[in-house]
């Protein structure tokens, strides 16, 4: 495998008045192209902050993030945005779908914003919604979908630009257990089909174990790394 993402000694300090709070305390790890990785940790352990830095949505106080061979902190904000829009996908605990638009329109939106023609954008969105099992729900608005269906739409939207890496922050936090398991199975299936890497942060050890590799975060540090041979077991 080739290195997709490299993190070296990532530290993040927030200052309020004279008080410094160190949220990340020197995080280092790599992700290979097409790899499925989870980071497990309780609320407040630094997982979401790390994800924001990896997605070029926030700056590290210290350390370096290289994505596709580029040092994120060395890029201008415009170049960061261009890299983010083309090579990264995002899935959150709350789906953040646009309430007045259908599932098809929500998935097509990133392409339309990027200047793709409406016909092409809708064709790509339709193909992805079919892939996530929602061909019968394309014309429904978010309020007409179940929680699991809304999150499937959010995943399809994250994939529509054909990113190299999807960053998922508690993507099943609002779903019941069985639906959450189905969403993780979907991510594995999409990974196998497209070789898109996934980095998922969660507090649920059982769900995290569905990824190829799990890392554990505690108090701003990766405290251990557990490898699972799920691919060989499944094969």
Curated annotation (Swiss-Prot):
Membrane topology classification: Peripheral membrane protein
SMART domains linked: AAA
Gene Ontology molecular function: ATP binding; ATP hydrolysis activity; transmembrane transporter activity
Gene3D superfamilies, A to Z: P-loop containing nucleotide triphosphate hydrolases
Gene Ontology process terms (BP): lipoprotein localization to outer membrane; protein localization to outer membrane
Pfam families referenced in this protein's UniProt entry, alphabetically: ABC_tran
GO CC terms, sorted: plasma membrane
Description of how the protein assembles with itself and partners: The complex is composed of two ATP-binding proteins (LolD) and two transmembrane proteins (LolC and LolE).
Name of the protein this chain belongs to: Lipoprotein-releasing system ATP-binding protein LolD
Lineage: Bacteria, Pseudomonadati, Pseudomonadota, Gammaproteobacteria, Vibrionales
